[in-house]
Amino acid sequence: MTLPFRAMEDLGLDALRSRWTHPVGVAVIDSGIDCEHPELRGRVAESARVTPQEGGAFQVVRHPEPLSQDLFTQGGHGTAIAGLVLRVAPRARIHDIRVVNPGGILVDARALAAALKFAALHEDIRVINLSIAADASWSNEHGIRRWVDEAYRRGKVVVASLSNRKRQGPPVDFPDVIGVHGADLGAYGIRYGPCLTAEFQSWGDRIPAPSAGGGESLRGGNSFAAAVTSGLAALLLGASPDLTPFQVKSLLKEGALGQHEDR
């Protein structure tokens, strides 16, 4: 069953931007960001890198100043994600958490857990964006679920993209997470379907986004749909900082561009 569509503008994006009263940090757990891109310069609060330690542990090394472009960022995935968040929520502050290797692969559950722990405990972060694919076997490994739950308990909105793989890994299927997959909905469109693995569909087709090294390119897919949704969550929190993650999710449902049931 498909219910009547509602325009995303019903959320009042311009009105929300004008009502922004509170700083909102958005963690981009990804491949890293080209912080010198003209669209991102001065808008990244910090960079942090997840690094392996002896004995198989991982540690987050924090850098008060944003890191420059390196081998990790050259693919441009994290740069595009951060840029899309900021195009939706221009006054958000990005926290660059580098966890994906130069090949664009998340190689270890412990690395993801370390990144989630850092973001969950960070006082300045309210939204956590995960546009990365984790292995389906990781759901109960090495604290991933624990730190997603802790982030939710601390009032942080966790947004994750559906994997492009057949089997889904964490945390997109966790109940405390806003799961997103891409669709051709037009600029900033969003749709809700409670029976889907990823409950929300968001704009995920031919999206102009910043490219590492300057300029922009067209992007598409689940990752970028999640970034748009994270930007919408940041807008809501900037206008109403006392909102809980549950309330943010409910408001996104109410502003959805239509609701449907999985057939």
Indicate residue ranges for each PLM-predicted region:
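Extracellular S/T/G-rich loop segment that most often corresponds to the catalytic His/Ser-adjacent loop
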Residues: 161, 169-238, 242
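Subtilisin-like peptidase catalytic core
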Residues: 63-135, 252-256
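C-terminal subdomain of the subtilisin-like protease fold in secreted/lumenal serine endopeptidases
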Residues: 1-5, 10-12, 126-130, 238-263
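Active-site/binding-pocket entry motifs
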Residues: 34, 50, 100, 186, ...
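Structural detector of well-ordered beta-strand residues that form the stable sheet scaffold
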Residues: 95, 157-159
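Structured catalytic cores of enzymes that bind and process phosphorylated ligands/cofactors
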Residues: 28, 80-82, 88, 97-102, ...
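Active-site core segment of subtilase-fold serine proteases
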Residues: 2-88, 92
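Mature extracellular/periplasmic domains of secretome proteins
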Residues: 15-21, 106-129, 140-154, 166-181, ...
